[in-house]
Every structure is written in structure tokens, then in C-alpha cells.
């Protein structure tokens, strides 16, 4: 089953992106480099719980 996860910017703490993942196959947290429109640069975004 795929669950909705929210990605949060590590610098400004704004929650910019939502995505889906299969938590049974990938139990670890998602970390990706994405563009933050508030910081106006690419930053690391982590999954929130």
C-alpha cells in the first residue's frame, strides 16, 4: 500500500512537496534535493512524520 508523505526543507522548515511511497518496501525516510521557493535555491528535503 502506498502512503502519502510530506517533504520538508531542512533550512527553512517549510513543507513544500508531497509524494507517495510504499512503506513496506522502503521503511527508511526519504531524502532528496529539491528546489525550495522560499529559500530560492536547491536544498535537502526530508520526509516528515
Swiss-Prot record:
InterPro entries for this protein: Ribosomal_bL33, Ribosomal_bL33_CS, Ribosomal_bL33_sf, Ribosomal_zn-bd
Any GO MF annotation of the entry: structural constituent of ribosome
Protein name: Large ribosomal subunit protein bL33
GO cellular component, as recorded: cytoplasm; ribonucleoprotein complex; ribosome
Similarity comment: Belongs to the bacterial ribosomal protein bL33 family.
Gene Ontology BP term (one): translation
Presence of keyword Transmembrane: no
Domain of life (superkingdom): Bacteria
Keywords: Ribonucleoprotein, Ribosomal protein
Pfam families hit by this protein: Ribosomal_L33
